[in-house]
């Protein structure tokens, strides 16, 4: 393509009159790279990213003795005030709070298949019905307290369900039994 364009340009220059031939400069090829100043950059990425001189390495989650559950599972257990704030957040988003509990297998496991995916084998039992029409986060925490009294050795979680999109939007552990 480029060679055909160049040959057309040369034909046009050769066939043109003398006044027009002087207007188009001939193609001399690419300029030598030696004429351009070149700065060599190292491949060291530590010079690019900086945290202000404070070098600290973050620990990874210990794989023994501490299991991961849902959203916020890396944090210490939430206080009542923090739980109220989380429930208020899901109410502000228009999600329906729902309380679920699990007695035997709160951790991720696969009983019937080994493929990874959203369905990881954890089916929790719903505590009562979803709290449609709930506007007060204290109502949700009262239900969590009732579930704790009924099943003191159960894991209890709060989920936020979006009934318009028919999806679970948030899920977090509200109570872990002693020893976890």
From Swiss-Prot:
<dbReference type="Pfam" id="PF12338">
    <property type="entry name" value="RbcS"/>
</dbReference>
<dbReference type="InterPro" id="IPR024681">
    <property type="entry name" value="RuBisCO_ssu"/>
</dbReference>
<comment type="similarity">
    <text>Belongs to the RuBisCO small chain family.</text>
</comment>
<keyword id="KW-0601">Photorespiration</keyword>
<keyword id="KW-0809">Transit peptide</keyword>
<dbReference type="InterPro" id="IPR000894">
    <property type="entry name" value="RuBisCO_ssu_dom"/>
</dbReference>
<dbReference type="InterPro" id="IPR024680">
    <property type="entry name" value="RuBisCO_ssu_N"/>
</dbReference>
<dbReference type="GO" id="GO:0019253">
    <property type="term" value="P:reductive pentose-phosphate cycle"/>
</dbReference>
<keyword id="KW-0150">Chloroplast</keyword>
<protein>
    <recommendedName>
        <fullName>Ribulose bisphosphate carboxylase small subunit, chloroplastic 3</fullName>
    </recommendedName>
</protein>
<keyword id="KW-0602">Photosynthesis</keyword>
<keyword id="KW-0934">Plastid</keyword>
<comment type="function">
    <text>RuBisCO catalyzes two reactions: the carboxylation of D-ribulose 1,5-bisphosphate, the primary event in carbon dioxide fixation, as well as the oxidative fragmentation of the pentose substrate. Both reactions occur simultaneously and in competition at the same active site. Although the small subunit is not catalytic it is essential for maximal activity.</text>
</comment>
<dbReference type="GO" id="GO:0009507">
    <property type="term" value="C:chloroplast"/>
</dbReference>
<dbReference type="GO" id="GO:0009853">
    <property type="term" value="P:photorespiration"/>
</dbReference>
<feature type="transit peptide" description="Chloroplast">
    <location>
        <begin position="1"/>
        <end position="56"/>
    </location>
</feature>
<comment type="subunit">
    <text>Heterohexadecamer of 8 large and 8 small subunits.</text>
</comment>
<dbReference type="Pfam" id="PF00101">
    <property type="entry name" value="RuBisCO_small"/>
</dbReference>
<keyword id="KW-0120">Carbon dioxide fixation</keyword>
<keyword id="KW-0113">Calvin cycle</keyword>
<dbReference type="InterPro" id="IPR036385">
    <property type="entry name" value="RuBisCO_ssu_sf"/>
</dbReference>
<dbReference type="GO" id="GO:0016984">
    <property type="term" value="F:ribulose-bisphosphate carboxylase activity"/>
</dbReference>
């Amino acid at each position: 393509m480029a060679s055909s364009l160049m040959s057309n340009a040369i034909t046009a220059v050769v066939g043109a009159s003398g006044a027009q031939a002087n207007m188009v400069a001939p193609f001399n090829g690419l300029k030598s790279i030696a004429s351009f100043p070149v700065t060599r950059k190292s491949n060291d990425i530590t010079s690019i990213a900086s945290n202000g001189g404070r070098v600290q390495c973050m620990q990874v989650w210990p794989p023994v003795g501490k299991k991961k559950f849902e959203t916020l599972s890396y944090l210490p257990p939430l206080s009542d005030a923090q739980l109220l704030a989380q429930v208020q957040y899901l109410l502000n988003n228009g999600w329906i709070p729902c309380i679920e509990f699990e007695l035997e297998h709160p951790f991720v496991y696969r009983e019937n298949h080994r493929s990874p995916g959203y369905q990881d084998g954890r089916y929790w039992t719903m505590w009562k019905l979803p709290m449609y029409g709930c506007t007060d986060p204290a109502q949700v925490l009262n239900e969590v307290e009732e579930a704790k009294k009924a099943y003191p050795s159960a894991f209890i979680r709060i989920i936020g369900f979006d009934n318009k999109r028919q999806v679970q939007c948030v899920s977090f552990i509200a109570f872990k039994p002693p020893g976890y």
